[in-house]
Amino acid sequence: MKICYLANADSIHTQRWVKYFADKGHEVHLISPRPFGDCNIENVKLHLLKRLHPQIRFISFIANLPLEIIQVRKLIKKIKPDIIHAHYIADYGFHAALTNFHPFILSAWGSDVLVTPKKSFIVKMMVEYALKKADTVTTTAKFMGKYLTKEFGLPENRIVRIPWGIDLKIFHRGYEEEVKKLREKLEIKDNSPVIISNRAIHPKYEIQTIVEAIPHITKKHPNATLIFIRGNGDKNFEKIIKKRISELGIDSNIRFIPRFISPKEMAVYLDTSDILISIPKTDQFASSVMEGMACGAIPIVSDIEAYKQYLKDEENAFFINPDDPKELTEKTIFCIEHPELKETFYKINKKFIEEDEDWSKNAVKMEELYKNLLGR
């Protein structure tokens, strides 16, 4: 097959999809406004969109929209793909829809349908148009399909749930030697409980709530260490967070990882961690959370529908209000003081991940969807 993706090339999720299909021998093209970043993926033809860069975000959006639409149309005519697959409906999905190319698949990521359309009437119309034009829309969470039907009138027979899942060949326990070296590198003592936030340093992940909880956690457990993985974060917001950390006097308890890290590196960080915190107000069931659970970390997550697909409060996770640092403090301290929960939760979470969220199995499902749409 000749597959053309429209997606953000510096996203680890995009990179996994294009690499999988390229490795399977398909001809893979990726249209993106950004390069791959720190990695290089062989046998994937990257088509970079040219963009204007006005300082004001809204002006940038208005200026780039027609420019990107024209470029995407020209590229699709040049590539002549068998199938188009756009990830993130609010922009790449809209661009793909305007080409009138079929078969055309959309993948909803979460905020592109849960948050962004509520902030802008223009974006809402773009999302509605893209959904209307798509042959199939994939979601990772059960509730997301119901939401698309209820809020956008998308017929159920055009929705397919294919969890992205995680690579269980990478994300698992057993990196003892690497964990030892990482603790030494980060100067974390052997008896120090480790908490990790592996979501991007961005306001939507309620990082500020985590920061406000830390001094209360370290008051009870002074040797507790929190690791922040910056990822594809917001640099201005990161400055605000670092300033607040200094104001609270908790610099010695924080480890910032200011770069993208490979999946293998992430697995070692997660194996090092006792507790994982993920508290956005809207989300699909994030792969980053499942990766942490597969490595044995206790999940503390926001009390939202997405996480309830697999998790139950106090049974294999802890739910909190993402606006409440006090509740986060209490649950984190409870986890630190009850280390036996780590093994109990791990056994439950490992089972559902292996059954339903194995990346290798779900990638095959996506390939089968492509073939069905092409009548092969």
Could you tell me what each predicted segment is?
Residues D313-E314, F318-P325, F334-E340:
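Conserved acidic donor-binding segment of nucleotide-sugar-dependent glycosyltransferases
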Residues I76, L131, V268-S273:
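Short alpha-helical donor nucleotide-sugar binding micro-motif in glycosyltransferases
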Residues C4, K189-Y205, V211-I214, I227:
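Conserved donor-binding/catalytic core segment of Leloir-type glycosyltransferases
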Residues I298-V301:
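Short hydrophobic beta-strand element within catalytic cores of glycosyltransferases
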Residues E238-F260:
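Nucleotide-activated donor-binding/catalytic signature segment of Leloir-type glycosyltransferases, i.e.
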